[in-house]
């Protein structure tokens, strides 16, 4: 038999078409590939302004604060606003930020609960705590109450001094047993290096508290802050804000409206 002659040009063409077809099929299976220079750029994180731009603002449904009709002294106004916050269902409306300062640590702040109000504002804590030590060095403090839903704030400045011992003892005995145990177990703000040892100290303190209902640490202190200045702030729908400041003058108070 004679040898079969194959057209080389035709064979090369068929081979080329087959390779292109196989390559195309491979691309379809692997998915489209985006060239590196046209890949989408990673989106940058939003700026702080972008994060808060859409945040809700106060729309208070409360009586407008007017200097002429405001009380002659600030405590009654504070109590009225506190009652409004309680009626509105504000969580812990008696919570406030206590600001203190010392030479070593500078200014610091933390949230506490108000214990009572008469002519002074009362709170309790250990005199050996950081805030207690700061007050011992500089008795000047500031208390800031903020009720966001009502668009209201009250800032009290004055001096914190230790009140009668019986007030501190009564407060401590009315605290939850677990809270009393925490105060007895370890000095406040002590660093915890050993969780197991801390738990054991807390268990011992619980046993002490259960055994003696009258147990009150010597360092537990009721502080009273006689206000020297009280500034009240209220957001309104018609204006950005209204501010009134009360300054103590002897046994009286001077009121002034402040520019926002």
Where are the regions that the model predicts?
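Binding-site signature for planar aromatic cofactors or substrates
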Residues: 2-260
């Amino acid at each position: 038999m004679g040898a079969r002659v194959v057209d080389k040009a035709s064979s090369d063409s068929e081979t080329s078409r087959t390779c292109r077809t196989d390559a195309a099929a491979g691309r379809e299976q692997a998915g489209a590939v985006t060239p590196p220079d046209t890949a989408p750029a990673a989106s940058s994180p939003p700026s702080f302004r972008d994060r808060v731009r859409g945040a809700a603002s106060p729309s208070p449904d409360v009586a407008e604060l007017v200097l002429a009709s405001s009380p002659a002294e600030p405590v009654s106004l504070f109590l009225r606003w506190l009652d409004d916050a309680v009626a509105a269902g504000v969580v812990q409306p008696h919570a406030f930020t206590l600001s203190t300062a010392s030479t070593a640590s500078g200014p610091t702040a933390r949230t506490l609960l108000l214990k009572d109000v008469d002519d002074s504002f009362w709170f309790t804590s250990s005199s050996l705590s950081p805030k207690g030590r700061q007050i011992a060095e500089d008795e000047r403090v500031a208390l800031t109450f903020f009720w966001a839903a009502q668009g209201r704030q009250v800032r009290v400045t004055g001096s914190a001094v230790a009140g009668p011992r019986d007030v501190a003892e009564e407060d401590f005995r009315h605290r939850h047993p677990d809270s009393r145990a925490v105060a007895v177990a370890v000095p406040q703000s002590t660093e915890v290096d050993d969780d197991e040892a801390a738990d054991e100290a807390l268990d011992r303190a619980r046993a002490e508290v259960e055994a003696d209902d009258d147990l009150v640490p010597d360092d537990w202190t009721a502080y009273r802050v006689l206000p020297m200045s009280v500034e009240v702030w209220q957001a309104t729908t018609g204006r950005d804000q209204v501010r009134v400041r009360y300054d103590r003058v002897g046994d009286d108070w001077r009121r002034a409206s402040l520019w926002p």
